[in-house]
Amino acid sequence: MRSPTVSVLVTILCIFSLQVWAVPHGGSRNSSASRVMSPLQHFPPINYQPKPSGIPYTIKNQSAQPWLYRTTAPITHSALAEEDSVCTSSSNSSGYWYEQIDHNGQSSFMDSKYKDNYNVFRNVVKDFGADNTGQKDAAAAISAAIKAGPSNGPDRSSNSMGTTGQPAIIYLPAGTYLMKSSLQLYLGTVIIGDPTNPPVLKASSDFADDHIIYAKDPNFGGTINFYLGIKNIIIDSTGVGADKSITLLDWTVSQATQLTNVGFNMPTNTAKHVGLTTQYDYNSNLILNDLWFKGGATGMKLSGQQWVFKNISFSGTTTGVVAGGTDIVFLGCRFEQGTLGIDAQGTSGSLTVVDTTGVGMGTLISSSSSNTAGNSIVLDNVQNSGATVKIGGQTTLSGNVANTWVHGHLYTSNNAKFQSQQGQTVTTSRSSSLLSGKNYFTMAPPTYKEYSTGQVLNIKNVPGIPVYGDGETDDTRNINLILSRYKTSCSLMYFPAGTYIVTDTIFVPAGTRIIGDAYASTISAVGSNFEDESAPRAMILVGYPGDVGVAQISDMVFTVADVLPGCKLVEVNIAARSPGDVGFWNSHFRIGGAAGSQVESLCTDDPNDCKAAWGLLHLTSTSSAYIENMWGWTADHDLDGDNPQTISTGRGLLVEGTAATWLIGTGSEHNTLYQYNFQYARNVFTAMQQSETPYWQGAGSRALNPTPWQYLDSSDPDFSNCAANDSKCRMALFERIYGSSDLFLYGGCNWVFFNNNGDCSGDCQTNAIDIANSTSIYLYGTNTKSTTNMILEGTKVIATQNDNAGGWGGVIAGYLYDS
């Protein structure tokens, strides 16, 4: 049992990943009375459990069955020869290519009565008349663009198009947009600006609301606010009086969302302007990246579950971040000319700060003292000239941290006795292949802003090689033909919104760059080629073993249209010549839980009857890849209806790469055998690994691991260390590390809520992490919930949750295995 003190900490600061209570913003955005919002203090009770619920999709095409009826896209006439296919720049091209290309995407499973009358892409100036000169109010026009549904049907606020049925790309050309009132987003909304000249949303001096943008869809709870994005814009409150309370953005959202390349411009010397909040409902977000904050009282005011903050800068902001949560990582951030960088008083689990700089700060980090393992702090390569860490108001550390500084429980291999450190320096011997200079390599999501329109190829517009993306036509052959013919180093393959049905492997050759309409461009597997569990077949195969070059994929979704026990969704073999040449950004996996997949309707009860996919992502031994903002989700609830979801996806993320692998802001949830598996892997850097165990596993489950999977791979755990009937031991591992070396894992968390979709008393699961036969393994900032053993070395228990009570259950500041 946890002590009352620990229980209070857990109650105060931990947020359930699928809590669905909606906290409305107060009704109409046109009523000033509705805009008074008070931040909630998120104190869920210890015994609270998520209550998954469906979202209505009342205008869905009920007859759409891609798993049954398919026609093959024809080749209508001779295609370009490969030597003629090299793309060239348009001599008269100017401006951002995304604004100029043909947008012929669709919502594939919308009722045909409405489908042709629904536009995914909306240019707020050309299509809705928004003023971008800064002279007239643009809020109403932008709001109309956000809200518009099919011209003959309901609008996007009507709660009638599910989660996946109402994708909307709201494009803002360059300019200044005067805002007299706020914008409200809905599920499936992505706001995109011109990265060559980012548009500015500038609040007027008489701005009426308390936020410029509300990202959270008010119809639903924060933890089911998926598929939202904002990128390439500036939000500006400098025209609002410094003495008026205003927040630029409410970002109370969860996984499969993206906030990147956004600037927050606020007046200096204000006590009331806040850049970003996440305080208006429970939320489970993964990553915020490549942002800047100028001025303001507070840059980000957070209450949530977990995050990694990557490449974020704060200049002249009084307090950079108020960080309320359990597992928080700062990576490559910069704080300058402020009073306090990170207020971690509310970080109940672990705060991990990596490759970060403070310049002209009063204090870089302030935290609370704790009598438990909670409030752990890890600093790794931090530069600061003044007070670096204050705990309980007292300066604990000043100046630079050249290596790694640990405050909290520290373990070494083969030793079940932790050291309680109040500030211990240890050595983390970083692999040079993972670095840019002294820092871990990172890069911003590519916008390809240097590309001309002539260098972008709409995959649906290639003469003679039709691709439909309509959720019913088999596009396999023609996608492969196009990717093969255009495998040059200069072409960008654009997949408009829609579902691309494939019946065999799509091969992505070296030289390929793919970009979709975020969360709306989906590749979906179906057919007998993916049915054999004993011989898994990749839906997407990126390069062959030994290939070296460029292969980049952004803004795509990968899924299955049927129960396919032999489907490995993505396999990567190619290695990058330079870091970032091979990568995935804002690309996600979804198994079940959505329109267009028979898994949604079939997999409602017994996991033995629903081996929906062999696994999600396999980074093979020859691969070298950079992955940022990726959620590997096997559905626990229905996004587009009310079907229960009891699905068995065999595996989450398997890493065997040895050259260099980066995983930044990733989540892997509800997969059967494991969420993350590092098998003979070397030279791996991670910043934030978030996971949940399948809700149907545990005491009372009809399937105890490795059941229902009969054909185990050599990399799979066999659970032979568990008694045959030990249901809590035979649950999915959060992380398995075997035969690996030089792994640098910052910020890992595993949350367990259920046994057999019902209540579990006390600990719900026995084991979280298993490490064996490895060297130079560094785990910093590890968090668990409702798990007995946090770390095993083979069969030996090293760290228990009871010994490391804090956060949402257990917290380990550092674990060094043979390091």
Protein language model features and the residues they cover:
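C-terminal, well-structured subdomains that either form a transmembrane helix-short loop-helix hairpin
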Residues: 481-486, 492-501, 505, 650-680, ...
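Active/binding-pocket-proximal capping segment
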Residues: 680-696, 701-708
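Long, ordered, helix-rich scaffold segments
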Residues: 749, 766-774, 778, 782-783, ...
